[in-house]
Design a protein with these regions (language model features):
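Low-complexity, intrinsically disordered segments exposed to solvent
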Residues: 1-290
């Protein structure tokens, strides 16, 4: 970093890590929301729920308010060896809406949700609103349990125009989200995520905005991002491109430390591989854990 000009290698690596953390962690929280809301809207509240209440959170439900309100408070527990979470999320659902119905929309308010990576203590803090639309109808719980006569596929769309992200260097930026998540079952839940926006001529865009260096970016999914319950709901494969930076950065997920596709590493990290062209025209590759 010379005379205030950010080294592109530094920006490529740091932005990739920021976007990966934001994307994987907000999707993980969306799984929490599914778990809680699916259970809340079931007739007895006691049906088997494969997506259990988060191990690092408490849940309160106000079914008498209008709209109905669910608060998830993350308590900083180390039950997940890879990260800790604090802060709260408030989910609202109109009293006239059943979440299982096609077209139902829940509104999610992130309130100082801080996610800290255990390996290096780096954190992001998220505030803002997003909506989750149940496009297909049905409940993720029934896909997980493979209950006969119910939807075998559930599709959700997540959108936001104002997710505020504070990075560990105290810089604050606003990002936008447009993701489509498809839930199927193959030895447990499989969650396949694709971007669904078109921004500046780029298709399949999942996130866009300004990175911590103050530069615009667009992140598109070039291969679907796949999360598997059989691997503890971790991102097991996928590829994105970051554009509008000094060079297009291609990031591939689900790899080992040598950059080769691998099976689930249990409590050890997966690795991602970044490929970009530096200012001197030389293609560079960086491999990092996630």
């Amino acid at each position: 970093n010379t005379n205030g000009i950010v080294d592109f290698a530094e920006e490529s690596v740091t932005h990739t890590e920021d976007q990966t953390t934001f994307s994987t962690e907000t999707d993980a929280m969306a799984n929490d929301f599914n778990s809680v809301v699916d259970n809340f809207t079931s007739l007895s509240g006691r049906e088997a729920n494969t997506l259990a209440t988060p191990c690092d959170a408490t849940v309160t439900v106000d079914s008498n308010s209008s709209p109905r309100k669910i608060t998830i408070t993350y308590n900083g527990s180390t039950c997940n060896p890879l990260r800790t979470r604090t802060g709260s999320v408030v989910i609202t659902l109109p009293t006239t809406v059943r979440w299982r119905d096609s077209g139902a929309v829940m509104t999610v308010s992130f309130q100082n949700v801080k996610i800290t990576r255990t390996a290096d203590n780096k954190s992001i803090t998220i505030n803002g609103l997003q909506t989750i639309k149940n496009v297909s109808g049905g409940l993720v719980r029934t896909v997980a349990a493979q209950i006969p006569g119910n939807n075998n596929v559930v599709v959700h769309e997540i959108r936001s125009s104002n997710m505020s992200i504070t990075f560990n260097d105290s810089s604050n930026r606003t990002w936008q989200i447009a993701r489509r998540r498809t839930f199927t079952n193959n030895t447990g839940l499989v969650i396949t995520t694709r971007g669904m926006a078109t921004v500046d001529g780029v298709n399949n865009v999942a996130e866009w905005g300004t990175n911590r260096f103050g530069h615009d970016f667009i992140t598109a999914t070039t291969e679907p991002m796949v999360v598997r319950q059989s691997c503890n709901f971790r991102l097991t494969s996928g590829q994105v491109t970051h554009s509008k930076l000094s060079s297009i950065v291609t990031v591939t997920f689900g790899l080992d430390s040598a950059g080769v596709a691998t099976t689930c590493p249990a409590n050890a990290p997966f690795y991602l591989k970044m490929v970009y062209t530096g200012a001197n025209g030389i293609t560079r590759t960086v491999i990092r854990p996630y």
